[in-house]
């Protein structure tokens, strides 16, 4: 599946370290800080948002009056979002991103503390790149970066 991306492989990481900008979305401050810290340890640039609506604003999708130029300035290579958030779920955020002509190619990873097969299948069928269980671990980020590298080549 991820050939050459074992736990000791630095070759997968080196070509993406400079460019991977991740938008991390979670309503829980502790979970959000944990994801941010792990991503930064993995040499990712990280922007955080406390809910789906804030994430949409950052991505330039929050206000219909905004121009698409804002999206280009704040380009992200990956969105990692919690599934269960008030106001807008991670699944709803996923759908909005995949409906956007400018963002539909951005991979979205859904995080959840609950391992519910129907939820996982629904997210994957709607375009999620991966569904991961909380808490996020450093090894998860390394696997994810290798997976993204394989998808881009």
From Swiss-Prot:
Q: Would the keyword Nucleus turn up in this protein's UniProt record?
A: yes
What does the PTM comment of the record read? Answer: Two-component system major event consists of a His-to-Asp phosphorelay between a sensor histidine kinase (HK) and a response regulator (RR). In plants, the His-to-Asp phosphorelay involves an additional intermediate named Histidine-containing phosphotransfer protein (HPt). This multistep phosphorelay consists of a His-Asp-His-Asp sequential transfer of a phosphate group between first a His and an Asp of the HK protein, followed by the transfer to a conserved His of the HPt protein and finally the transfer to an Asp in the receiver domain of the RR protein.
Q: Do you know which CDD domains this protein is assigned to?
A: REC_typeA_ARR
InterPro entries hit by this protein = ARR-like, CheY-like_superfamily, Sig_transdc_resp-reg_receiver
Report which residue ranges the record marks as coiled coil: none
Q: Where in the cell is it found?
A: Nucleus
Record flagged with keyword Transcription: yes
According to the UniProt entry, which residues carry 4-aspartylphosphate? 82
Give the superkingdom in one word: Eukaryota
- The Response regulatory domain sits at 21-149
Q: Which UniProt keywords apply?
A: Cytokinin signaling pathway, Nucleus, Phosphoprotein, Transcription, Transcription regulation, Two-component regulatory system
A Gene Ontology biological process term = cytokinin-activated signaling pathway
Q: Which GO terms describe its molecular function?
A: phosphorelay response regulator activity
**GO annotation, cellular component aspect:** nucleus
Protein family according to the UniProt entry: Belongs to the ARR family. Type-A subfamily.
What role does this protein play?
Functions as a response regulator involved in His-to-Asp phosphorelay signal transduction system. Phosphorylation of the Asp residue in the receiver domain activates the ability of the protein to promote the transcription of target genes. Type-A response regulators seem to act as negative regulators of the cytokinin signaling.
Quote the protein name from its UniProt record: Two-component response regulator ARR17
| Source organism of this protein record | Arabidopsis thaliana
Instruction: Identify the gene encoding this protein.
Output: ARR17
